[in-house]
């Protein structure tokens, strides 16, 4: 019978404390930081309906999980389209009159307004691509 010697499991000099994927070069991407503004029952007409550019309105509530999921997406869109599109958020708990006027029954609901008129409605937490595709139809 031949005996086979085993090597002790000792880390080699080449290994490091960090896994290989962590040693890779960092990804660089440009992120435009912006936040959607806030509107309420008192400011909605002036900010949204009288806007010279299209407006994306995010109807939300602080207790709504899906609303919190899409909030950063709306903020990203606000940054990416800041010169072409106005993005605002309306808290339906604090501004029930506007929410009622536009028949908001489910949140999150996103509406796109252009020229003071409602053009499009998106209900639910949808992917960013869906929101962008909808918004781009109304940009000049």
Swiss-Prot record:
Keywords: Chloroplast, Disulfide bond, Electron transport, Plastid, Redox-active center, Transit peptide, Transport. It comes from Chlamydomonas reinhardtii. Residues 1-34 form a transit peptide. Disulfide bonds join 64-67. Pfam families: Thioredoxin (PF00085). Gene3D superfamilies: Glutaredoxin. It comes from the Eukaryota. Residues 35-140 form the Thioredoxin domain. One of its GO terms (cellular component) is chloroplast. Its main location: plastid. The active site is at 64 (nucleophile), 67 (nucleophile). This is Thioredoxin M-type, chloroplastic. It is found in: Plastid, Chloroplast. One of its GO terms (molecular function) is protein-disulfide reductase activity. Signal peptide: none annotated. Participates in various redox reactions through the reversible oxidation of the active center dithiol to a disulfide. The M form is known to activate NADP-malate dehydrogenase.
């Amino acid at each position: 019978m031949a005996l086979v010697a085993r090597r002790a499991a000792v880390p080699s000099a080449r290994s490091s404390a960090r896994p290989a994927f962590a040693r890779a070069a960092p990804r660089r991407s440009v992120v435009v930081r912006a936040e959607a503004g806030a509107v309420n029952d008192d400011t909605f007409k002036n900010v949204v309906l009288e806007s010279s550019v299209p407006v994306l309105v995010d109807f939300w509530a602080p207790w709504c999980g899906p609303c919190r999921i899409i909030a950063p997406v709306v903020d990203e869109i606000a940054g990416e389209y800041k010169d072409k599109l106005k993005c605002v958020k309306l808290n339906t708990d604090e501004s029930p009159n506007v929410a009622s006027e536009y028949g908001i029954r489910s949140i999150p609901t996103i509406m796109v307004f252009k020229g003071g008129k409602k053009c499009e409605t998106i209900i639910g937490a949808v992917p960013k691509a869906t929101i962008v595709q909808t918004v781009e139809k109304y940009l000049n």
